[in-house]
């Protein structure tokens, strides 16, 4: 979702609208710039996909924390009295998620002990509980092996439950212009790829 910027969780840019759009998705495909090109300026002045990922992660986590805090406030009194078992279970689930978010991690890092806990967590539709795939947009020279930006991102997400795929958008646009399957296969073979990035996605 283009246009999501630092401060979106507080309404910066078109923040709340973008965050609402993300809430409606089944998964997040996060495209990150992983190439240098002096003709294409970066909004933060320097290419750093790890920083870019962390900015978006933080905005999503802050929005989820806002959601969790509101839910905790709603059920806390009932849970403390102890008469309402559903409220107590919900309070425990919300508290577990809150703890993870406060550590700067995503809700998908939380593991639950029962189907009931999983159900309560799913019903929150948290932004950071969605599956995520990071798409590294690289230059043509890095389409096969990746580059140092891709390596840095791989290191940054190694403990996340996330996928990384390397794509050269420029090559993908060239592939899209090729008419026949045979010509596409020949083109891919010439640049050392088995299949297009779109096919891998």
Language model: regions and residue ranges:
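Structural and coupling elements of P-loop NTPases
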Residues: 1-201
């Amino acid at each position: 979702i283009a246009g999501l910027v630092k401060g979106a969780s507080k309404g910066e840019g078109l923040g709340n609208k973008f965050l609402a759009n993300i809430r409606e998705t089944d998964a997040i495909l996060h495209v990150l710039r992983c190439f240098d090109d002096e003709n294409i300026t970066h909004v933060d002045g320097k290419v750093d996909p790890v920083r870019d990922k962390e900015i978006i992660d933080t905005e999503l986590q802050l929005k989820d924390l806002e959601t969790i805090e509101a839910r905790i406030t709603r059920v806390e009194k009932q849970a403390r009295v102890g008469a309402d078992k559903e409220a107590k279970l919900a309070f425990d689930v919300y508290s577990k998620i809150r703890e993870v978010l406060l550590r700067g991690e995503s809700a998908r890092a939380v593991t639950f002990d029962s189907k009931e806990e999983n159900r309560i967590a799913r019903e929150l539709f948290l932004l950071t509980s969605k599956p995520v795939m990071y798409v590294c947009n690289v230059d043509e020279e890095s389409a096969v092996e990746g580059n140092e930006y891709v390596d840095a991102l791989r290191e940054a997400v190694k403990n996340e439950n996330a996928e990384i795929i390397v794509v050269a958008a420029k090559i993908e646009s060239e592939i899209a212009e090729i008419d026949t399957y045979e010509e596409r296969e020949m083109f891919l073979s010439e640049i050392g790829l088995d299949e297009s990035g779109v096919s891998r996605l």
